[in-house]
Amino acid sequence: MAAVRLKEVRMAQRAEGLATVLAIGTAVPANCVYQATYPDYYFRVTKSEHLADLKEKFQRMCDKSMIRKRHMHLTEEILIKNPKICAHMETSLDARHAIALVEVPKLGQGAAEKAIKEWGQPLSKITHLVFCTTSGVDMPGADYQLTKLLGLSPTVKRLMMYQQGCFGGATVLRLAKDIAENNRGARVLVVCSEITAMAFRGPCKSHLDSLVGHALFGDGAAAAIIGADPDQLDEQPVFQLVSASQTILPESEGAIDGHLTEAGLTIHLLKDVPGLISENIEQALEDAFEPLGIHNWNSIFWIAHPGGPAILDRVEDRVGLDKKRMRASREVLSEYGNMSSASVLFVLDVMRKSSAKDGLATTGEGKDWGVLFGFGPGLTVETLVLHSVPVPVPTAASA
């Protein structure tokens, strides 16, 4: 009898349907930097204008980045007050940390408030919080700070994820899926908040991979509400999370890594990161979509982490994608740069909005099935299979 009762309890705890994205919100710092003029600004503010050859290399990197603009918390005024941040490897961790501890939760708050407003439900319905960032390790962490900033219940179940890097946005969705589907009625607030203050530093001839990061990375935060079995009257589904997996790519150790030092976060990139990802992308697709009998990669919508133009180009070429398949990822790269873990949630937001604007039938550019990829340190690849929903028909109240 006890075994039967335990089974009944277990079944009562589980949701009936798939985890679903119910709302998305994004936020960026007010300070905007344009890629066309960034090399001049960067070498001037770091007092490195004497490195003319290096500046020319950086200019070429920026020109090839396919980025139009980025947003950054670090303004020239802040950098003038913190000159050690502008040096290449000066002891500056305390100054960087002081900035991140305040700004990471604050930026996350901006994104979370937008997601909560779109969701339209009371804060008391949020049961879980998952917070992801590469900056500002502290106890209690950014999850605690955000709970206070938003006025969430003190009983919200929190999970703090530090130092995941660029695959972290997919990771939080995978974890939220597991939470929502195994806790009936759960509503999970996921937040990814990233700022470049921990990794900003002056240029150095012997560390060109650091310059690559300075040409690509920007600040941004994204949030989403995840839950299973949406209330048909009060909640509007955006995407369903069908399956999720994570893998470490073979022979990829050291391709992307980051180390927290007294000089801040140092990031190292091998040149062949795009090649390593593209060589393994088909296997990830086959493993994810074999149960669905899908093998035409142009028949699905794509949410790929916009790590840089070379990654998107190589993946497109490898699987024979139409150029328009990566449109949402390229738009986020162009307008915001690589925002690490927050990026894929920005891409989700762009896709569902552009699908509605273009009059398409579903939130996934008119397609039913889609894939979300996160790429990051390890090399680690996160793969999520998504299912779109019909684009909502505007009502008189929302028009």
UniProtKB/Swiss-Prot annotation:
Catalytic function, reaction form: (E)-4-coumaroyl-CoA + 3 malonyl-CoA + 3 H(+) = 2',4,4',6'-tetrahydroxychalcone + 3 CO2 + 4 CoA
User: What is stated as this protein's family in its record?
Assistant: Belongs to the thiolase-like superfamily. Chalcone/stilbene synthases family.
Instruction: Look up the EC number in the record and give it.
Output: 2.3.1.74
Factors inducing expression: Strong in response to inoculation with fungi.
Presence of the UniProt keyword Transferase in the record: yes
InterPro entries tied to this protein: Chalcone/stilbene_synt_C, Chalcone/stilbene_synt_N, Chalcone/stilbene_synthase_AS, Polyketide_synthase_type-III, Thiolase-like
Coiled-coil portions: none
Instruction: Quote the catalytic residue positions.
Output: 166
Q: What is this protein called?
A: Chalcone synthase 2
The organism named in the record is Hordeum vulgare
SUPFAM superfamilies named among the record's database cross-references? Thiolase-like (SSF53901)
